[in-house]
A protein has these predicted regions:
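Non-catalytic helical/linker scaffolds that mediate oligomerization, partner binding
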Residues: 1-281
Length: 281
């Protein structure tokens, strides 16, 4: 399986990581180059999306770096978006930006995505996981691209924002499978809704006979620790009890200190749940 970034917004480069302070006025711009300080003395950072200032409105929330930094939009002028820092934090290079509840008018498949997919097709990838699928049309565009390039690879739709939840059933019907990508989903939606969204997604996939993957933060603590938390064990157990077809690791095995132990742990929990189901039957 190969991940395809999809419509993603990121900050640009900054000379060095700096701390945003609560209550600070801060600007997002497009085309300003490396971040720094504007003529009015307000610190700023560039974004990679020219339509950024057109998609959002005064009062909207801007989340940076997986929601660790929160800002509120105060004013918009041309390509400049002025914000107030609500939750402070360190800002480094190329941090991911989330705009909860905002429809982002980026293409479903960017030029960079097409180049990445071409490499995947040449390598014989079986599945492409398309990030930030918003509606069935996004999948139709991707299916056509694969067909035009003589690929029979299947598409896994990653649901990661409110628009995807609204169009959930239609997205599942148009895809070859679904991934509940809980990282961005937990940022874009109220966190208390996340378990309900996961259950609804799994149940809908079962009804439509489509495979479903539950992913992200399965064993997050094991990036640094050799043992899982009790909450993580219960989370994995419940995902399998709800009849998810797959549970997937990410950061745990890419940057974690205990990648093999993570695989062994999640497998052990899955097998225990399956033995319990067999005993009940």
């Amino acid at each position: 399986m190969m991940d395809v970034k999809g419509p993603e917004i990121r900050t640009g480069d900054v000379p060095e990581t700096f701390e945003l302070e609560q209550g600070e006025t801060f600007d997002f711009t497009f085309g300003a180059g490396i971040g720094g300080i504007g003529e009015d003395g307000v610190r700023r950072v560039d974004v990679n999306y020219p339509g950024f200032s057109k998609d959002i409105a005064v009062g909207d929330t801007v989340l940076v770096d997986s929601g660790l930094i929160r800002l509120k939009v105060l004013a918009i002028e041309g390509q400049h978006v002025r914000c107030e820092v609500v939750i402070p934090g360190p800002l480094g290079n190329r941090r991911h930006i989330n705009l909860p509840g905002v429809r982002v008018n980026l293409p479903a498949l960017t030029k960079k995505d097409q180049g990445d997919v071409d490499v995947g097709i040449e390598a014989g990838v079986d599945f492409f996981a398309l990030s930030f699928v918003r509606e069935p049309d996004d999948l139709d565009i991707f299916h056509r691209y694969l067909a035009d390039n003589a690929s029979t690879a299947k598409i896994i739709a990653k649901i990661e924002d409110q628009q995807a939840i609204t169009n959930l059933e239609a997205i599942i019907r148009a895809s070859d499978g679904l991934m509940v990508a809980r990282g961005d989903l937990g940022i874009e939606c109220p966190f208390e809704d996340l378990p309900l969204i996961q259950s609804r997604a799994i149940n809908t996939c079962i009804q439509l006979t489509k495979p479903v993957i539950v992913a992200t933060h399965m064993l997050e603590s094991m990036i640094e620790s050799p043992l899982p938390t009790r909450a993580e064990v219960t989370d994995i157990f419940n995902a399998i009890r709800e009849q998810a077809d797959c549970v997937m690791l990410s950061g745990e095995t890419t940057v974690g200190k205990y990648p093999v132990e993570c695989v062994e742990t999640i497998k052990r929990i899955a097998r225990r749940m399956e033995r319990e189901e067999k005993a009940v039957l």
